[in-house]
Amino acid sequence: MPQSLTLLPQRVLAVAVVITALALAALITLATGQPYVGLTLAIDQDRVVVLGSTAGLDVAPGTEVRGLRSGGTELPLAPVDLTPEPDMAFVRYSDMDAFFERQRARSALLRSGEAWLQLADGRELSLPVTQSRPLRDLPFVFWFQLFCAAGGLLAGASVLAFRWQDPSTRYYALTGTGMLLFAGAASVYSTRELALDGRLFMALSSINEFGALLFC
């Protein structure tokens, strides 16, 4: 057997490992590079409520949130704004575009460095905004999706490396690539804290959709 063919499995696996490592590093960088306030929100029927705060805010769990403010800019916060997967929440493209625009506005407000949390009881709490999210704050779901993304690509590459002439293994490797794309993209936007830049969110959502098509 020619030496080039003998070395093919090692080459395929090496390339797959490098691609996976670079992709994971990029996703972690994106996830931690967002404004952070140490606040966990949740949906309670038709309300947005506080679950907890790691920043020592004087707010009890279950307190209803109305929105964010910075200077003269006030941005209301609705339950739909917390949806982890916009593709499942909106039917019309115009609604999704409006969602991305609200994300952009909130992200810009938080990046301004001064933000206030508006509560339904009329109080406003100053948010201690930092421009990066601590690695320890990333939830289990984020890491699980990264595990799925990496596992998909490496599993596909492992089969392709040893049976690269079989068309079915090439298709299997393609589905693994799709898993890397859709699970990796979703890991960033589905576990965001308060907001993600709208353009980045839109790009990640498109990558997620493309990856899902490859996977199917």
Annotate each language-model stretch with its function.
Residues 46, 113-115, 123-125:
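Envelope-exposed proteins and targeting segments
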Residues 62-65, 115-117, 164:
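Terminal peptide-recognition signature
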Residues 30-81:
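PDZ/PDZ-like domain segments forming the peptide/carboxylate-binding groove
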Residues 137-159, 163-216:
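Individual alpha-helical transmembrane segments in multi-pass integral membrane proteins
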Residues 68-115:
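PDZ domains, with a preference for the canonical peptide-binding region formed by the helix
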